Amino acid sequence: MYIAPADATLGEAEWRPFVEATGFGHLVAAGRNRDVPVVVPTQFLLEGDTIRLHLVRANPLFAALAENRRVLLSVAGDWAFIPSAWKTIGVEDPELGIPTTYYAAVQLTGTATVHDERHEPGGVADVLRRQLQALQPDIAVADPAVAHPRQIQSILGITIAVDSVSAKFKYGGNVDEAHRLAVVDHLQARQGPGDAAAAGHVVRRLAPRPPDTSNPRPH
């Protein structure tokens, strides 16, 4: 995706919490010599540099993975439409404002490994356990390998070793602080879906912060 300099991520400390909190995205597998890639909406778990998820065995994604294990997970959210008049302040003509959409988007690229209980006992169950522990840590569940042996045969686990991250946070970084704060006021007043999250990103990205000294993957 195209990332303007003003929208570039501030680093892993910014994109990782967004990806972990969202927890849902679209997994894209190009396969080989296909007219279009296979795209699957899915829940996922990001642990370190590894993505874990599971899909029904009949999912067409697995045919694409058999051709090419390289995949991309696209995660987007916290979006809000910004009307043209919101982009102007003071004596500026509201009719000349340029509307836009604020949003966050992260693309994680890596190599997928498929786990099949028929050939790797415990592989799918491990993915399920990790996902459930993250999604409902306070709710006890039976061990899937023991309680649901037949059902677990109908799904396959996927782990993705992430080696590249591209992240974009489009929240008015191309305009000055006064114009961005004016948009925040409008978002807080409108209180529509996504408005609070978008306003939070604008304010957070205005705050001065030390440079990211971690060892983030390419983005």
Predicted stretch roles:
Residues N33-V36, F44-R52, R57-P60, G77-F81, ...:
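Short, charged/polar surface micro-motifs in flexible loops or helix N-caps
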Residues A58-V127:
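Short, structured beta-strand-loop surface elements
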Residues R52, L72, T109, G157-A161:
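Beta-strand secondary-structure signal
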Residues M1-R52:
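An N-terminal domain-cap segment
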Residues A29-N33, P41-T42, L61-F62, P94-G97, ...:
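Catalytic micro-motifs at enzyme active sites that drive phosphoryl/nucleotidyl and oxygen chemistry
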Residues T113-H219:
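C-terminal edge-of-domain segments
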Residues R16-F18, F62-L65, H148-Q153:
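A general structural signal for short secondary-structure junctions and capping/turn motifs
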Residues T22-F24, N68-V71, I155:
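Short, surface-exposed beta-edge/turn micro-motifs
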